[in-house]
Amino acid sequence: MDKIIIEGGQTRLEGEVVIEGAKNAVLPLLAASILPSKGKTILRNVPILSDVFTMNNVVRGLDIRVDFNEAANEITVDASGHILDEAPYEYVSQMRASIVVLGPILARNGHAKVSMPGGCTIGSRPINLHLKGLEAMGATITQKGGDITAQADRLQGAMIYMDFPSVGATQNLMMAATLADGVTTIENAAREPEIVDLAQFLNKMGARIRGAGTETLTITGVTSLHGVEHDVVQDRIEAGTFMVAAAMTSGNVLIRDAVWEHNRPLISKLMEMGVSVTEEEYGIRVQANTPKLKPVTVKTLPHPGFPTDMQAQFTALMAVVNGESTMVETVFENRFQHLEEMRRMGLQSEILRETAMIHGGRQLQGAPVMSTDLRASAALILTGIVAQGVTIVNNLVHLDRGYYQFHEKLAKLGATISRSSEV
């Protein structure tokens, strides 16, 4: 099993880091590539991540041709022939995001069968919003033996109100509605940048979607879609992770290709702490004098609130800031598991339901730790950089789902870090 080894203590991260295409954008784009019955789809700026390989295999399992040119960060999808309607269990079970193929398969074929998905263990994350929305559009849904089966000769436009602005459900329903008969309105829709990117992608294909980035989406169904070329939006969570890394280490880092507007909630909290964040021609520069930073209170919320996918990394920053900071996690339950591992490194914290109190500013010590999910992996590595001594981060299967060559990028910025596959 691979592990990351960090010699921490006095590292100051400096230099430039290039941000990859967004994992959370490319996965639904691959699902949407199921929809076109004409032409090929080409995705550029694709990150080389295990989740991308998994989604490629989910799509291939539908008898769709998928070619991944890793050297060019480019995927070509040809779904123009007959496609199957059952997604392969062995791949769907590995990744939560794979549920978003349900809507496209159903819209394209009139029938779909998808296994209950897997992924990080950070809460129950029910899929009822996906299923309720499809039922509102006329689908008959059955769940049996761990499988979800959906049937609809042709989906019908509907008015859908979502009890929570779920990103995955918004994506699934928006894709399904592109080929529905009539107009579909989704109220309380997710507003994340990845939703906007997906809507732009679908509109290029011939879909008619209005309101992406707002609470109300309006989709007028069409009879068919065609393949297109598209550049995947930059990964705001990877960008945010390196912003936090610079802030934790009194660093001076230019995060190339980072999009200011996509990272506004995080940038606001960094500035409140006393971090210097400036927009430059080629990206965002973060500079900090960590001992002078101030504690803050943060609450995770759906976009445009503070992203839950930055919660773990930001609590790592709170750990090195003098004073008591508070993190309130409102999106997922069970997402403070990394704090238990950070306590092995000397962190003092208390957790009461959805609130974590972080007593920061004490010198942390290196220790062997176990990553529990994707963003926790990054948080533990960043903590290892500032901790005195050697930190070993185990269970990197989560890290590889969302970060490409993370240790190499940190090493180029000055961290003493390596990856080992020794037992």
Swiss-Prot record:
It comes from the Bacteria. The lineage of its organism: Bacteria, Bacillati, Bacillota, Bacilli, Lactobacillales. It comes from Streptococcus pyogenes serotype M3 (strain ATCC BAA-595 / MGAS315). One of its GO terms (cellular component) is cytoplasm. Belongs to the EPSP synthase family. MurA subfamily. InterPro entries: Enolpyruvate_Tfrase_dom, Enolpyruvate_Tfrase_sf, MurA_subfamily, RNA3'P_cycl/enolpyr_Trfase_a/b, UDP_GlcNAc_COvinyl_MurA. Phosphoenolpyruvate binds at residues 23-24. Cell wall formation. Adds enolpyruvyl to UDP-N-acetylglucosamine. This is UDP-N-acetylglucosamine 1-carboxyvinyltransferase 1. The keyword Membrane does not apply.
